[in-house]
């Protein structure tokens, strides 16, 4: 199942991070992938991490490497739109159970919010999670997802719950900046 392939991405996202290209807006830099046709903003001072298998790209904070953003691309099973996969809450719940906190991972994911947003003529789902890890650790994830040309593109930003207050605006802006050139 396409969502299961996100498991590898999220596992990497919990432990990795990213870097930048062009100067951007308010503490953010711009990254564009001309091959896969997506772009997003990420925090200044983050660097790209090369990862085999899983995410298409990962950036993380050099000082706090568990703070990261990543993009995962998975084929869909014939679904042409996000609505074909379900409502924002349904897709958020599925991603939470299959990718962010899969069975036997020791993690649980609580979907805090799920909304659809339009960017140009495309629909994206913005999903926010509180993730509980073993030993009372908590993380906060915000994701943006779109189905485009038979593939599910998922942008995910993650930080510790303790740093969420400080990182919320930057990571939310990064997630909302994720777009497909279509």
Segments (PLM) and residue ranges:
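Proline-anchored loop/turn motifs at beta-strand termini and strand-loop-strand connectors
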Residues: 35-54
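Bacterial signal peptide processing site
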Residues: 22-25
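Soluble non-cytosolic domains of exported or imported proteins
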Residues: 37, 85-90, 161, 165-169
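Short acidic-hydrophobic surface loop/beta-edge motif
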Residues: 29-34, 115-118
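Surface-exposed amphipathic alpha-helical segments
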Residues: 46, 150-182
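C-terminal motif of bacterial Sec signal peptides marking the signal peptidase cleavage site
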Residues: 17-20
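Conserved polar/disulfide-associated segments of primarily extracytoplasmic proteins
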Residues: 49-153
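Bacterial N-terminal signal peptides that target proteins for export
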Residues: 1-10
């Amino acid at each position: 199942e396409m969502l299961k392939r996100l498991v590898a991405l999220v596992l990497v996202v919990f432990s990795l991070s990213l870097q930048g290209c062009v100067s951007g807006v308010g503490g953010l830099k711009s990254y564009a992938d001309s091959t896969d046709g997506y772009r997003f903003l990420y925090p200044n001072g983050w660097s790209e991490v090369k990862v085999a298998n899983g995410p298409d790209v990962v950036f993380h904070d050099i000082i706090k490497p568990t703070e990261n953003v990543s993009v995962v691309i998975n084929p869909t099973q014939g679904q042409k739109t996000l609505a074909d996969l379900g409502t924002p809450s349904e897709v958020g719940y599925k991603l939470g159970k299959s990718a962010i906190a899969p069975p036997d991972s020791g993690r649980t994911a609580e979907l805090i919010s799920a909304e659809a947003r339009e960017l140009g003529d495309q629909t994206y789902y913005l999903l926010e999670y509180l993730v509980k890890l073993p030993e009372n650790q908590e993380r906060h994830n915000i994701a943006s997802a779109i189905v485009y040309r038979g593939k599910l593109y998922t942008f995910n930003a993650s930080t510790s719950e303790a740093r969420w207050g400080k990182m919320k605006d930057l990571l939310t802006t990064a997630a909302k900046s994720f777009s497909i050139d279509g």
